[in-house]
Amino acid sequence: MPVKIIALAEGALTGFTDEIFDLPHTLAARDLFIDVPGEETELLGTLAKLYKTYIIVQCKARWPEVMDDRYFNTLFVIDPQGEVVHKAAKNHLWCRERSCTPHDIYDRWVECFGEGIEAFYPVLKTDDIGNIGTICCSDGEYPEAVRALTFNGAEVVYRPSEAVPMTNSGSSPGGSWMVQNRGHAEFNSVYMLCPNVGPVYLSPSSRFPMDISGGNSHIVSYRGEIMSHSTSSNNTAVSAVIDIEGLRQFRAVNLNSNWLKDLRTELFKDMYRQPIHPKNLWLKDDPAHHNEVDDVYRSNIESLYQRGTWTRPHNSFDGARLFPEGDPGTNAQKWQDIRQMWAVWNED
């Protein structure tokens, strides 16, 4: 049986150096990351043509058509002709990620792409392998992300990678990551393609990798069933048959567990009128370092207490801070120091 979709894990193309070392955003955009399309996608396009397959990939990429000196956690699809036919940006970040998001420059993003859901969660519609939506890692912590793709027509959702402890929490293989992806599939009647990254090297010259992900790559059917799963945290492959016609028949005739058909949308329309995380944070300023972004998250938590959404614990404190007060954070010189240290660490 021919392979029609190959899905790579997050980090396979551009890694995680920016977030591990809290690099200045502009420096990382210029020094580390890529353009889509670009020379990397040309190489992948050659492979797509050779094997007559679609390739789905995550990377950190610049979007110069939107804003200079910004990079986004980017999902893209290459078709069997070797062309980039889909590109989307991650909207929800892990608290240590340094990427910009469409929400962080909301006004500019709307100016470029419009303000509909399709501007933030686009779906690639094909004649041969169904409709593909793409999110990444932390995006999948929010049920709304996959629901948005579903409303836009998605039948297959690519959600690469998650990290420890989410992949090994609880007693079941795959931890809460597996639970989330089975839930996404069941609630929305979509396939979930969920490859996880293998061991990560901090630099091209590193001798030893780190296991940050915990493995557990898997594919889930539109009924929420695990079709293929590997518990390994090494570089692995999982595979399954994606039956788009079966999914479409299920949606057409099932009156019991085809949930989207009778969603009472009017009941929920007021839930999101009041914002939680502020938009346009980095419209004028460079995306901030970890310690500054932590203060934004703490402010969001306080707002949920103030509006009565959450109840405060009996004992409460701010928690550990990333840097002591007065620490200037990471800068361009420290980045050069890090690069020199890599060379020293790996000398024979």
Regions found by a protein language model. Name each.
Residues 12-29, 67-71:
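Metal-dependent catalytic neighborhoods of phosphoester/phosphodiester hydrolases
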Residues 57-58, 73-77, 122-124, 217-219, ...:
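Short beta-strand scaffold segments in enzyme catalytic cores
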Residues 12-15, 165, 246:
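Feature marks short, surface-exposed loop/turn motifs that line or immediately flank catalytic pockets
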Residues 1-5, 14, 158:
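N-terminal active-site segment of His-dependent metallophosphoesterases
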Residues 2-10, 54-59, 193-194:
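Short beta-strand segments at enzyme active-site cores
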Residues 187-191, 196-348:
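C-terminal beta-strand edge segments of enzyme domains
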Residues 33-56, 131, 136-239, 341-347:
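CN hydrolase (nitrilase-like) catalytic-core segments centered on the catalytic cysteine
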